Amino acid sequence: MAPWALLSPGVLVRTGHTVLTWGITLVLFLHDTELRQWEEQGELLLPLTFLLLVLGSLLLYLAVSLMDPGYVNVQPQPQEELKEEQTAMVPPAIPLRRCRYCLVLQPLRARHCRECRRCVRRYDHHCPWMENCVGERNHPLFVVYLALQLVVLLWGLYLAWSGLRFFQPWGQWLRSSGLLFATFLLLSLFSLVASLLLVSHLYLVASNTTTWEFISSHRIAYLRQRPSNPFDRGLTRNLAHFFCGWPSGSWETLWAEEEEEGSSPAV
């Protein structure tokens, strides 16, 4: 690997996240927080639980940021095979669209990411904090990561607050609690962002839509002339399909079924 590859945006972002995660954890252990008090009293269950949650959130972060989000295969296929696939999967009203950047036929709900330079299946968004797309393959893990990360952040926020001492002279307080207070503010900001992200993504999952579709539905060919979301199968089935892949089936098939139901005359 070339030396300059170590300075790629992905490496820098993931290294920064890892350093920040363990740096904040170290601050919570070094100051007079409940975490340190438990450790000094020999009550190691809660400190170990906190460390395991931090480690779990970090491993989930790395998994989501490094895994294939659902890239569309760029290998060329025979023309006849493409025609058969298009006929079988996509209704005539909405033919497969060829990406003008990577020249692949995009499945329904796929979109080209300019940062990754690839088309991604069930594209949600490109996450700059992970330097990776969130798509069909890693979106469920992304939601699980957000939930675990929020638990860690809120617990860390409580621990930071437990170590703050306000009734001290200004200079002494700054030396003893300045870094911990800065950590508290940072955790407050991260907790707010993680909460908003988790709530918004749970809403998207519950309605079987994506960030891109929610924001740009008026510009997306398969959504802009539909009065409702054609992929919404109800809360239970949406959650089951998102997290467990059940019931299975292509988005093209589901879209076609909804189109037939919408066009069939009322009895």
From Swiss-Prot:
Catalysed transformations (reactions)? L-cysteinyl-[protein] + hexadecanoyl-CoA = S-hexadecanoyl-L-cysteinyl-[protein] + CoA
GO annotation (BP), single: gephyrin clustering involved in postsynaptic density assembly
Presence of the UniProt keyword Iron in the record: no
Q: Which family does it belong to?
A: Belongs to the DHHC palmitoyltransferase family.
Q: Which organism does this record belong to?
A: Homo sapiens (Human)
Q: Which cysteines are joined by disulfide bonds?
A: none
User: Per the UniProt record, which EC number(s) apply here?
Assistant: 2.3.1.225
User: Which PROSITE patterns does this chain map to?
Assistant: DHHC
**What residue ranges lie in the Cytoplasmic compartment?**
1-9, 65-140, 200-267
Q: Which GO terms describe its cellular component?
A: dendritic spine; endoplasmic reticulum; endoplasmic reticulum membrane; Golgi apparatus; Golgi membrane
Q: Residues on the Lumenal side?
A: 31-43, 162-178
Q: Does the keyword Nucleotide-binding apply?
A: no
- Entry's Gene Ontology molecular function annotations: palmitoyltransferase activity; protein-cysteine S-palmitoyltransferase activity
Determine the domain of life of the protein's source: Eukaryota
Broad enzyme group: transferase
Instruction: Alphabetically list the UniProt keywords.
Output: Acyltransferase, Endoplasmic reticulum, Golgi apparatus, Lipoprotein, Membrane, Palmitate, Transferase, Transmembrane, Transmembrane helix
Residues spanning the membrane: 10-30, 44-64, 141-161, 179-199
This protein's domain notes? The DHHC domain is required for palmitoyltransferase activity.
Q: Which parts of the sequence belong to the DHHC domain?
A: 97-147
Q: What is this protein called?
A: Palmitoyltransferase ZDHHC12
- Tissue expression profile of the protein: Widely expressed.
> What happens on changing residue 127 to S?
Loss of protein-cysteine S-palmitoyltransferase activity
